[in-house]
């Protein structure tokens, strides 16, 4: 059975539509109106092996906050929908990914409990036109509505773009491993994953 999540959300601030296929080929068709977010979503799809379609429209004349956060929210819900009851998942995984001088590690638990620890170290206020304070906001919404735990640590790096990009790549590689199917049993001593 295909592991697919597809949904949309419309509010007075945003309209977001996401289709996510867990067992994809890493294809991305993304347009959010926020260039750096599009870049990060392309990276997430490519390195996780998931196929991702995202369309978002938001009140970016105010700022990018609502669009970025709501994209994370709908993406999380789509992942949650695609993973079903999670009983056959490997569940836990981690990955360290370098990008030139930057190194990040992501550890994930797809066991149904939402938590985010995000340590990027100091970042400038912006990467291009992207407000860097929105990066953890995106991750917070993604983990909360995707019902998973993420510990993301950027160990070091001088270039803010490299630090954030290595973090997203590490998350993607960890997700790729964690969504793999177990050959038998459930990744919980309780017998259920919740």
UniProtKB/Swiss-Prot annotation:
One Gene Ontology term from the biological process aspect of the record: L-histidine biosynthetic process
CDD domains: IGPD (cd07914)
Record-annotated membrane-spanning stretches: none
InterPro entries: IGPD_sf, ImidazoleglycerolP_deHydtase, ImidazoleglycerP_deHydtase_CS, Ribosomal_Su5_D2-typ_SF
Main location: cytoplasm
GO cellular component: cytoplasm
Cited PROSITE patterns: IGP_DEHYDRATASE_1, IGP_DEHYDRATASE_2
GO molecular function annotation: imidazoleglycerol-phosphate dehydratase activity
Keywords, alphabetical: Amino-acid biosynthesis, Cytoplasm, Histidine biosynthesis, Lyase
Catalytic activity line of the entry: D-erythro-1-(imidazol-4-yl)glycerol 3-phosphate = 3-(imidazol-4-yl)-2-oxopropyl phosphate + H2O
SUPFAM superfamilies, alphabetized: Ribosomal protein S5 domain 2-like
Subcellular location, record wording: Cytoplasm
Entries under Pfam families matching the protein: IGPD
Signal peptide (residue range): none
Enzyme class: lyase
EC number: 4.2.1.19
Family: Belongs to the imidazoleglycerol-phosphate dehydratase family.
Protein name from the UniProt record: Imidazoleglycerol-phosphate dehydratase
Species in which this protein is naturally found: Rubrobacter xylanophilus (strain DSM 9941 / JCM 11954 / NBRC 16129 / PRD-1)
């Amino acid at each position: 059975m295909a592991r697919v999540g597809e949904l949309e959300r419309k509010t007075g601030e945003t309209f977001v539509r996401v289709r996510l296929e867990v067992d994809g080929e890493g294809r991305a068709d993304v347009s959010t109106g926020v260039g750096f977010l599009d870049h990060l979503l392309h990276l997430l799809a490519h390195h996780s092996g998931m196929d991702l379609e995202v369309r978002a429209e938001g009140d970016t004349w105010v700022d990018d906050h609502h669009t970025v956060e709501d994209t994370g929210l709908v993406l999380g819900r789509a992942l949650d929908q695609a993973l079903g009851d999670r009983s056959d998942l490997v569940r836990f995984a981690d990955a360290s990914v370098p990008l030139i001088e930057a190194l990040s590690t992501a550890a994930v638990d797809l066991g149904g409990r939402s938590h985010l620890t995000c340590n990027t170290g100091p970042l400038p206020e912006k990467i291009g036109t992207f407000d860097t304070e929105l990066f953890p906001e995106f991750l917070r919404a993604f983990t909360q509505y995707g019902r998973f735990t993420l510990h993301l640590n950027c160990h070091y790096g001088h270039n803010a773009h490299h630090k954030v990009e290595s973090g997203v790549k590490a998350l993607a590689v960890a997700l790729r491993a964690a969504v793999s199917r177990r050959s038998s049993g459930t990744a919980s001593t309780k017998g259920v994953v919740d």
